[in-house]
């Protein structure tokens, strides 16, 4: 089954905030690598969406996006809805999606 990725406004904002932070505080290269890793991870999720860990919300799953961020998402019909990208430096249990 082919799944379509749908970005919520929150997930899109989170992604762009991280990209901006990396460009401003690290380098354009760091931002590009983050984008590439994110795309690879999203491809894996689209291929096998039920492998990651479920959260306390029965329909919400989470997966480690990289060393510093976790991605929350849900699967509805043929859609994978990306809910948010949350930094590990914050308490993940305080995320509204956990």
PLM feature spans:
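Basic/aromatic recognition patch in beta-strand/loop cores that engages polyanionic ligands
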Residues: 40, 48-80
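Enriched for short, Lys/Arg-rich terminal
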Residues: 68-70, 74-98
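Arg/Lys-rich, positively charged N-terminal/basic patches that mediate binding to nucleic acids
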Residues: 1-35
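Alpha-helix N-cap/helix-start and coil->helix boundary motif
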Residues: 12-13, 39, 70, 89
């Amino acid at each position: 089954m082919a799944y379509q990725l749908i970005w919520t406004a929150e997930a899109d904002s989170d992604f762009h905030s991280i990209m901006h932070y990396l460009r401003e505080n690290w380098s354009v290269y760091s931002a590009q690598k983050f984008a590439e890793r994110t795309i690879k991870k999203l491809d894996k999720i689209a291929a096998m969406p039920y492998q990651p860990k479920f959260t306390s919300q029965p329909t919400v799953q989470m997966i480690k996006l990289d060393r510093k961020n976790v991605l929350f998402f849900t699967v509805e019909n043929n859609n994978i809805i990306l809910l948010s990208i949350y930094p590990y430096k914050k308490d993940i249990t305080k995320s509204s999606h956990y």
